[in-house]
Curated annotation (Swiss-Prot):
Quaternary structure and partners: Interacts with chaperone PapD. Assembly of the P pilus requires periplasmic chaperone PapD, in absence of the chaperone overexpression of this subunit is toxic, where the protein accumulates in the periplasm. PapD stimulates release of PapG from an inner membrane-associated form (where at least 1 disulfide bond can form) into the periplasm and also helps it achieve its correct digalactoside-binding conformation.
Gene3D superfamilies listed in its UniProt record: Bacterial adhesin receptor binding domain (2.60.40.1370), Fimbrial-type adhesion domain (2.60.40.1090)
Signal peptide: 1-21
A molecular-function term among this protein's GO annotations: carbohydrate binding
Taxonomy, superkingdom: Bacteria
Cited function: Tip adhesin component of type P pili that binds preferentially to host cell glycosphingolipids such as globotriaosylceramide.
Entry keywords, A to Z: Cell adhesion, Disulfide bond, Fimbrium, Secreted, Signal
Organism (species): Escherichia coli
UniProt protein name: Fimbrial adhesin PapGI
Length: 335
């Protein structure tokens, strides 16, 4: 005779992986460097080198996030991530802009390369360091730590604007340099601070780059006003006005002229044009060709000119009388 025993299954479900989730205590310790580099006399075609070293020393906590205990109880793990976050371009107080191009990152992992404004360099070490004690494992901003690990320097090329005026310059390169110290309770439960969070940390390190620009190119003016004047609307379509810009260079160089519209056009006619309002566009030409880019070359010191021409365009039924205005930006750069 068989006897049946009732069987009961109890199942408890929780959202996500909460049952397996561990805790994380994360601190960021920042260095506070002030370095100077004097590149001497340079020309805009030169690309002086910029070294950002990794020096050991005392660092101060500038960030913390602790989801775990303040003091350990039993086994826990540790890991470290060295961070360098360096701007891709730097402005002076006068509004001039230089770009930093990576020349050497040996020993570093360069990550999040699509960021428009910053380079991110990471170096991890002492992964999953096993520890069993009752030490303090959550520290607040202001706590100081001696950091003695050594890493390779970062080397950059400094790209100068082709139209940088002659004179002495000081470019402050402010960057983030520090260590992310991570405590956690589950083996291999690694954590890296998000890039958007890292780049918001205080840039406590400065490298002051100084140099004297002794050669380059200068446009004859910073503003050109192409004025069509007062026109009868029936005769406005196709009206042409122009201005000529002179550029003087005293170094052998190729200069790319690029036009960028500030006011979008009304019509899509596959030409570079600028919107003027009231149903009108301005179709732009450079040296008689409907284009938005041109390259000029200098082999000896001297001036060259570029003619910027505006041709009014408006379609029947859309164009209206009134004041017309629009703008564009001309950029001088190396090809």
């Amino acid at each position: 005779m068989k006897k049946w025993f009732p069987a009961f299954l109890f199942l408890s479900l929780s959202g996500g992986n909460d049952a397996l989730a561990g805790w994380h205590n994360v601190m960021f310790y920042a260095f506070n460097d002030y370095l100077t580099t004097n590149a001497g006399n340079v020309k805009v075609i030169d690309q002086p080198q910029l070294y950002i070293p990794w020096n050991t020393g005392s660092a101060t906590a500038t960030y913390y996030s602790c989801s775990g205990p303040e003091f350990a109880s039993g086994v826990y793990f540790q890991e470290y991530l060295a961070w360098m976050v360096v701007p891709k371009h730097v402005y002076t107080n006068e509004g001039f802009n230089i770009f930093l191009d990576v020349q050497s990152k040996y020993g570093w992992s360069m990550e999040n390369e699509n960021d428009k404004d910053f380079y991110f360099f990471v170096n991890g070490y002492e992964w999953d360091t096993w520890t069993n004690n009752g030490a303090r494992i959550c520290f607040y901003p202001g706590n100081m730590k001696q950091l003695n690990n050594k890493f390779n320097d970062l080397v950059f090329r400094v790209l100068l604007p082709v139209d940088l005026p002659k004179g002495h310059y000081n470019f402050p390169v402010r960057y983030i340099r520090g260590i992310q110290h991570h405590y956690y309770d589950l083996w291999q439960d690694h954590y890296k601070m998000p890039y958007d969070q890292i780049k918001q940390l205080p840039a406590t390190n400065t490298l002051m780059l100084s140099f004297d620009n002794v050669g380059g190119c200068q446009p004859s003016t910073q503003v050109l006003n192409i004025d069509h004047g007062s026109i009868v609307i029936d005769r406005a379509n196709g009206n042409i006005a122009s201005q000529t810009l002179s550029i003087y260079c005293d170094v052998p160089v190729s200069v790319k002229i690029s036009l960028l519209r500030n006011t979008p056009p009304i019509y899509n006619n596959n030409k570079f044009s600028v919107g003027l309002g009231n149903g009108w566009d301005s179709i732009i030409s450079l040296d008689g060709v409907e284009q938005s880019e041109e390259i000029l070359r200098w082999y000896t010191a001297g001036s060259k000119t570029v003619k910027i021409e505006s041709r009014l365009y408006g379609e029947e039924g859309k164009r209206k009388p009134g004041e017309l205005s629009g703008s564009m930006t001309m950029v001088l750069s190396f090809p």
